[in-house]
């Protein structure tokens, strides 16, 4: 079966599956829901369109950690604060600095309140993602769309842009997913002060129910946001011999 490769490299990327309210998490590797969403953006599949999205969700996914990245987080505030306003009658009024969507100022118990948010991400990470499926026509269209996407592509969040092309020139391979990940050249940028790793961590979808349970298998359109489970097993493989990497 054909295998499609994606290069996910950037200064910041985030692949959350359990984010709630003011806590935005990230996993240690790209989530399947996030990768499928990226493909949907490339193909121009709308958030309400399950018919065209569903074939993508049937692809098997593997991830190779060419550069694991450094877990970090941003502390953000969406705030108000207050200011003193002198009314026409000369009285001093305490007023919020923030204006609500309805054009009014917060008052009462909500005066001066602010929202704190913790947004976790991976810094300086590079992943080689492989997707395997039987529909070669779908794989070819998706590969072409990654080169000329309908909508902008991002690494988990709209502001997290890739530092290299997600599209890989020879990224559609007629070989099993495992074989492609085992032999494809390392995509971590070489730096003068560091040596390439001797081994790379890879994750595969498990068919026998072993491994780690992840709740990132899309079951509906992204507008409905329903996700199911899948099992993922990880192992270490030797670094492929062809190490030099030139961005596409």
Residue ranges, per PLM feature:
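Hydrophobic residues positioned within well-ordered beta-strands of beta-sheet architectures
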Residues: 4, 61, 127-129
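Internal, well-folded beta-alpha domain core
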Residues: 66-248
């Amino acid at each position: 079966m054909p295998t499609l490769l994606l290069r996910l490299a950037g200064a910041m990327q985030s692949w959350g599956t359990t984010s709630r309210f003011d806590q935005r998490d990230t996993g240690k590797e790209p989530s399947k829901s996030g990768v499928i969403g990226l493909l949907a953006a490339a193909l121009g599949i709308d958030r309400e369109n399950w018919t065209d999205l569903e074939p993508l969700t049937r692809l098997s996914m593997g991830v190779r950690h060419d550069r694991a990245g450094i877990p970090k987080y941003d502390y953000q505030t969406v705030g108000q604060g207050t200011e003193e306003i002198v009314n026409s009658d000369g009285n001093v009024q305490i007023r919020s600095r923030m204006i609500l969507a309805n054009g009014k100022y917060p008052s009462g118990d909500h005066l001066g309140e602010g929202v704190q948010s913790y947004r976790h991400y991976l810094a300086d990470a590079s992943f080689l993602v492989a997707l395997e499926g039987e529909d070669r026509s779908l794989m070819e269209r998706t590969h072409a769309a990654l080169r000329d996407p309908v909508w902008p592509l991002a690494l988990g969040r709209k502001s997290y842009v890739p530092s290299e092309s997600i599209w890989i020139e020879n990224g559609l391979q007629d070989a099993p997913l495992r074989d492609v990940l085992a032999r494809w050249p390392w995509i971590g940028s070489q730096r003068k002060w560091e040596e390439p790793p001797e081994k790379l961590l890879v994750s595969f979808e498990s068919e026998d129910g072993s491994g780690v349970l992840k709740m990132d298998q899309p079951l509906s359109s992204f507008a409905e946001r329903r996700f199911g489970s899948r099992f993922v097993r990880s192992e270490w493989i030797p670094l492929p011999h062809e190490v030099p990497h030139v961005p596409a």
